[in-house]
Amino acid sequence: IDDLSDSQSCEKIHTYVQNLLRTSYQDQVKVSDNHFLNLILSRYIQLCRDQNIAFETDIRAGLLGFLDYQDMTALFTNLLDNAVASASEMESTSFIDLRIRHLPESSCTLISLINSCPSSPYDALTGTLSTKKKNKMRHGYGMRSVSRVVKAHQGNMDLYYDDESKPFHTTVQFPDE
């Protein structure tokens, strides 16, 4: 999806989305009032079940309507791909916690994704996110797509790792439109 998004292959993205809509995943979960987000999340909920990763969500109603299918796909699939990859490396209990809510005092929508992470994902020398992907040339495309979506909607993204308790935190804030 990321490659299709970057090359702006709208017809191929549309075909992919239509195939998603026809999959058996569509009846598995309803964690939000956004049908398309449910389709995306159902895949990750199943992946987490298969890998014994606890997956928790708290998604408030009426949010994310400003994201089109392409942006929603780029944002959530890339963040969740990374979260599942990281959580699956844990030797003990692993988890992913996704929360989406509106913060009226800040006039923004907050996406909070916290996942277990066995060690710091940051390169000790450069301070940038590192990868364990076999094809190092593909490193960074997903997060660049996420950053593109965040920037396109005048949002902010923060990433941080807690060395003591071992979770990796991703927070994305989108201002009210």
What is each PLM-predicted segment?
Residues 15-22, 33-51:
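Short beta-to-alpha transition helix within the HATPase_c
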